[in-house]
Design a protein with these regions (language model features):
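Conserved core of the sugar-phosphate nucleotidyltransferase
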Residues: 63, 105-150
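Short alpha-helical oligomerization interface
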Residues: 19-24
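Conserved N-terminal catalytic core of the sugar/cofactor nucleotidyltransferase
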Residues: 2-5, 13, 27, 31-96
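Canonical Radical SAM [4Fe-4S] cluster-binding loop centered on the CxxxCxxC motif
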Residues: 16
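The conserved acidic donor/metal-binding loop of glycosyltransferases
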Residues: 99-101
Length: 150
């Protein structure tokens, strides 16, 4: 099993917080987002870590994991970034994470235990959280449809 962290973008909506560093270098408490994600992978025995980088790629040099460069990071989207890891996705089971969303180590543990072809974590209370950020929560929300298991 491998981890893929999507960290190519700048996070320009964060303004001055990403002028000198990628959004994944911002902190929750005393720890950078990227470090928390990697630590949660390692705790769950995901040793092969791949990071798709772009903006400020040199800042990622000392971070554990293989770096995969998206040279089109300014003009492409998250799916293009993910396509940079196509060989890995085709050859191994992978957990894919955004670099600016922190998942609890227990959430990663749940993903590791699942056996479906595609498994997605979701928060059933998403709307309450997104209403804090946006008047219309659907303005900036990535979404998916799902059916419950029987």
């Amino acid at each position: 099993m491998q981890g893929i962290i999507l960290a190519a973008g700048r996070g320009s909506r964060l303004g001055h917080l990403t002028e000198k560093k990628p959004k994944s270098f911002n902190k929750s408490g005393k720890k950078r987002y990227i470090d928390t994600i990697i630590d949660n992978y390692i705790i769950n025995k995901i040793k092969k870590i791949n990071i798709i980088v772009g903006y400020k790629k040199d800042l990622f040099k000392k971070i554990r994991g293989k770096k995969i460069y998206n040279r089109k990071w300014q003009s492409s989207n998250i799916f293009y970034s993910l396509s940079r890891a196509e060989k890995i996705l085709k050859s191994d089971t992978c957990i894919v994470s955004y670099s600016d969303i922190i998942y609890d180590k227990e959430a990663i543990k749940l993903l590791v235990k699942e056996s479906g072809d595609i498994v997605i974590l979701n928060n059933v209370n998403w709307k309450k959280i997104w209403k804090i950020r946006f008047k219309n929560p659907l303005d900036d929300l990535e979404n998916f449809n799902y059916s419950k298991r029987s």
